[in-house]
Amino acid sequence: MNHQSRKADAFDKIRKYDNDLVKYYEIEIIDYEPISAKAYKLVTNANNEYFFKETNDVALEKYQYLANQGISNILYPLENIEKRFITKTTQRSFYINNYIQQIPIREDAKVANMFNELNTLHNQTSMRKTLDPSKSRVKFDELSSQLDYKFRVLEQMVRRVESRPLDIFSMPILENYHTILNAKKELVKLQKRIISSVKARESVNYSFLHNNPSIDHLLNVRGVNYLTSIDNGKTGISSLDMAKFYVKNESYDIDFKSMILNEYYDENHLFYYDYFRYLVLVIYIKRMPVSTEDYINASTFVETSNCITRYFNFSDYKEETRYPNETNNN
């Protein structure tokens, strides 16, 4: 869809909020620019520029919670005339911010800055909780079922490829399948260790997670970095945020090894590091599309295999610490 088509399609949608913007923010739109399906740049009759975003109803609770905690590296929405960050209407909930024009900086620098701000968020909202086997079991059972199904589908696809003469598309699939199987073995090993921690009801830190840690959700305002778009944030274990962050950005020339090592590796308490590694592999496997077209599958296998290979190079810089109940067969 070209720019003009996007703008035309957005016209009716954004105009539905005209009265609400006047009522709750005392601003009148004279122009707008679509940024995404839910976000717009607005220009008012006073020639001021705002960022407008549709959101969910519970976003108010999240922004209010972080504000009450005094978390300073969040870019909070502008308050409406009711002193609320989020405005609920008959259309949808939304919020606005001053539109901040960003100066282009190197992507790898943004990645490093995002890592620092995520750590700040996690550390400042940290609270100790005991791992709950009853809650964790449901999640792991569901995840295990999804992974088992995905590995079965991948195996069936590989067997189908093996039954045919080799060609330029089947070769990459067969050559890289062993890497997928190595990931499966690693997942089994890590899950056993994580479940062991859960059964022991270990005490761990829970934090507020951004839950969508893209570098697009980091803004620099007069030299200070702020996290944005925490609409989908939740309370959880920071390994989840970092796994998502790593998968999105591991291709950049950043020293992820030392960054993750310094933050998560503790030979006396491997839970956070194990959970991070486990989630990285889960993301890689779950996002693999399986197509009826072998050229698509070949590309998928090569890309995923390369990611998993970098993962093993990344994670193997420390010797494995054995749990007491793990036997050494050497």
Give the location of each predicted region.
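Juxta-kinase regulatory segment immediately upstream of eukaryotic protein kinase catalytic domains
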Residues: M1-I29
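N-terminal ordered "arm"
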Residues: Y24-Y40, N45-V58
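Active-site acidic catalytic loop and adjacent metal/ATP-binding pocket
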Residues: A39, P77, K189-M242
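ATP-binding pocket architecture of kinase catalytic cores
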Residues: T44-K135
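A glycine-centered beta->alpha junction motif in the catalytic cores
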Residues: R92-E107, L154-S163, Y284-V302
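ATP-dependent phospho-/nucleotidyl transfer catalytic cores
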Residues: S134-F208, M259, F312-N313
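Helical subdomain adjoining the active site within ATP-dependent kinase catalytic cores
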Residues: R164-D167, R193, S197, D294-N330
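Active-site activation/catalytic loop segments of kinase-like enzymes and analogous catalytic loops
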Residues: S238-Y272, V282-N313
